[in-house]
Amino acid sequence: MESYKPVWLKGAVILAINLIDKGYKPVAVGLGERDFYIDVKSDTSITLDEVKKAINENVLANVSIENNQIVYKGNKVSIIEDKVSISTNLNPKYFEILNISTHHPNPNEQYVRIRGVAFETEEQLKDYLSWLEKAEETDHRLIGEKLDLFSFHEEAGSGLVLFHPKGQTIRNELIAFMREINDSMGYQEVYTSHVFKTDIWKISGHYTLYRDKLIVFNMEGDEYGVKPMNCPAHILIYKSKPRTYRDLPIRFSEFGHVYRWEKKGELYGLLRVRGFVQDDGHIFLREDQLREEIKMLISKTVEVWHKFGFKDDDIKPYLSTRPDESIGSDELWEKATNALISALQESGLKFGIKEKEGAFYGPKIDFEIRDSLGRWWQLSTIQVDFNLPERFKLEYIDKDGIKKRPVMVHRAIYGSIDRFVAILLEHFKGKLPTWLSSVQVRVLPITDEVNEYAEKVLNDMRKRRIRAEIDYAGETLSKRIKNAYDQGVPYILIVGKKEASEGTVTVRARGNIEVRNVKFEKFLELLITEIAQRDVEQTTVKALK
């Protein structure tokens, strides 16, 4: 979808200009996850027919975009909210308006929000609308509501998610897995505050670069900011005592809560929120250690994606090289870039190159992952940073006794845990692997006469830390089975008089698989192994068949 966004934004600009020509007052043009949006200041609603009349490709020749401003008839209009590079060659002709709604930025104003897409060919539009229809069937927002995982509430604030117990279970499992990965690489976990004086953000540069996303307030004469990043706090921990070359590399990890004030039109379920948790990590190391560190990070990143069932063809790394505006010497950039290239080549992964798309402080590797709907998501990132060590005057004593600057590496594998939950829900269509499922087994007693045995089965599983629950015989058995399937429960254990007398269970799994006369202890043993190994497939039922 990322490749479509420039043409979407160009289409939105064209539509906004036509609306201006018709006397409307667009105040914002931007991009959502799956469409563009235009906010129009209007006391009355705007109909679909009125919007369609405003779609006119003939305006294209008279519109250009300079420095994120629309230039039209000699006037510059500053309503574009996304800094997306837009080629003058883009020629969107085919539009689809997806939604028209109203919202109130304050009690005295009303905005009409128009959402839509635009493409250069009719075939592209048809293909996208067909894909969108399929994607809506697996929308994580609907799955989250259906499975009681999370919710959003206007009274709590837009873009601020509330995870319910079952949703938090999924997050906890993801965090536990990443803790194991971090431990295997030698990370030390830290915890840092959600709020800092803005001095730290001014030194880091975030105060300038992220000012529109920073949440800032004053208390007792000091200015504070809610953190949009974890890196400055990790830097202060590094600076808390002298370091020598023998100490390096130093690796800090944190499941850090960060907050970024995204524009309301850009918010989209868990995919774009204002508060989220990163599986963040920062490494402080010598230049000569960089290549081996990057190799390890690439290897572990691929290991993680394989664990979720993604194949090598579904994993695409990109090397982003030095942009025109950058800091650091040519020699440092060359060393860092060569280290990334060598590490990528030795990984055996095919990688692309994004020329001049590195950060201003250093080159980086971004990983894109393809889901079951064919979408590519940018998730993992490995970024080399010469800038922050310089800004914060970081030092270590080298073996010759001279103070030197360490190199810093930023890395996140999931990226945002909240966003990753959304991607997994859509990728697996709500049927998460057993180890991730909030309810792993549901026990269904056929009649009340076997409730005692059903409860013993339940309690034996819970003693082994299996997330199990029981659905007593209030409904028909077939309806209870359907409910369990619909709610994404991986395993259903059916028990009747025969099972109770023999110490067995009937096992039902996804794909309408049923295995009868299974010794409960055998099932339990296999299930514990499946969960411990974090298998993507239901290996327990495969072993029983």
UniProtKB/Swiss-Prot annotation:
Regulation: Inhibited by 1 uM borrelidin (BN).
Keyword Hydrolase in annotation: no
SUPFAM superfamilies: Class II aaRS ABD-related (SSF52954), Class II aaRS and biotin synthetases (SSF55681), ThrRS/AlaRS common domain (SSF55186)
Catalytic: annotated span: 139-433
Subcellular location: Cytoplasm
Catalytic reaction annotation: tRNA(Thr) + L-threonine + ATP = L-threonyl-tRNA(Thr) + AMP + diphosphate + H(+)
EC number(s) per entry: 6.1.1.3
Reported function: Catalyzes the attachment of threonine to tRNA(Thr) in a two-step reaction: L-threonine is first activated by ATP to form Thr-AMP and then transferred to the acceptor end of tRNA(Thr). Also activates L-serine and transfers it to tRNA(Thr); unlike most archaea the editing function is found in a freestanding protein (ACQ980D1). In vitro when both subunits are present, or if the 2 subunits are fused, L-seryl-tRNA(Thr) is no longer produced, the 2 subunits edit incorrectly charged L-seryl-tRNA(Thr). Has no activity on correctly acylated L-seryl-tRNA(Ser) or L-threonyl-tRNA(Thr).
Alphabetical list of NCBIfam families matching this protein: thrS
Protein name: Threonine--tRNA ligase catalytic subunit
Gene (name only): thrS-cat
